[in-house]
Each structure stands twice: as C-alpha cells, then as structure tokens.
Amino acid sequence: MFYSIKNSEILKIRNDIFLHNAVPYLKQNGFVESPFLDANFGKNNRQLYIYEMCRLENSNLEFLTTYISLRDRYIQIRLNIFELFTKPKNISKLENINGIKFYLPPNSQKEERLDIDMLKTIPLFSYRFWFENYKLKSFHTKFGLNMAIRKLKYLIERDMKNINSFVEKWRQFHKTNITDWEGNIIELNNP
C-alpha cells in the first residue's frame, strides 16, 4: 500500500546527494580532503560514511566533517575552526601528521552542526531547525521520495555554495582555540 525502500538504499541516496551536491561546491570554496594520516573520506563501515574536509584560511584551519549513518536519515555536516601556531605555508604541510586530537575534547566542544546548531533563537521557534535540516524526510509514495530527495539536494547545494556564511556565523558564537599542527592546545579560548 505504501511505498518503502530499504535503509541501505536510503543511506546510498544520502551519500550520493552529499557527493554530487556538496563536495563540488566545497571544493570550489577551497576545501580539500583532510591531509591528516587518520582522515576518513568515504565508507567507514557498512553503516557509516565519514567525509573529512578542511581548508586553510590565513592561519585558521577550518574543518568540515560529514557523517551519513544508516541509523538516521540525516546528513550531519559539522564545522570546527582552529588557529594554527605556527602557520603552515599550505595545507599539504599537514600531510602525514596525526590529527585525532582535533576531534577530542576540549577541541571538539566548539564543533557545530550546520543545519541545527548556531541558532539565534530557541529551536522551538526556529524555522531552520524544523524545516531546513539536512534530513531525508519521510515519504509514502515514490513521488514523495522524489520530492524529499529534491528538497534535500536543494538545501545541501544552497548551503555549501554559501559555506562562508556558516564560517562567519561560527565566529559569532566562538573564538578559535590556538593549537599546534597536531591539535595540541596552546591557548584555550572560551566561549
């Protein structure tokens, strides 16, 4: 009676949306695959895709980490920014360095999801929180699935084209921690 597809197919749809509607625009905006030794870019296991991308702006290392899981219908894109001391000449200087400390506390405490974090109001009153999150919405027909896919593609593409606005928004909420190239804290800045 109702149209349904397997969770593995939904995972593949969301992964394809990210690869075709996000990655090209992120690359246009200067993001590259993370150069660190332990970086992920693709399938982590049967139930999870992880994409780690970053760019170097002056001495700031801007991380975008994307999680696409079988367990939910979201494309979770997270942003975190660090000030590196000393400034590398280019991002390739970070190759063959272990970057795991960028993902551990206290560094991870300033990581924000692009779709539902960094709201200027409480989530209950936020249009973006309820209607513009990166979720493949529920559907009951093939037409409904196609509409949900089209909407998710539109949101992802629109926001990845304008990724710099999210970087500016992140800066309104946080100050960058100063770290070395491996993510060791030199100066912890709050908030």
Report the location of each language-model feature.
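Intrinsically disordered, low-complexity regulatory regions enriched in serine/threonine/proline
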Residues: M1-N21, E33-P191
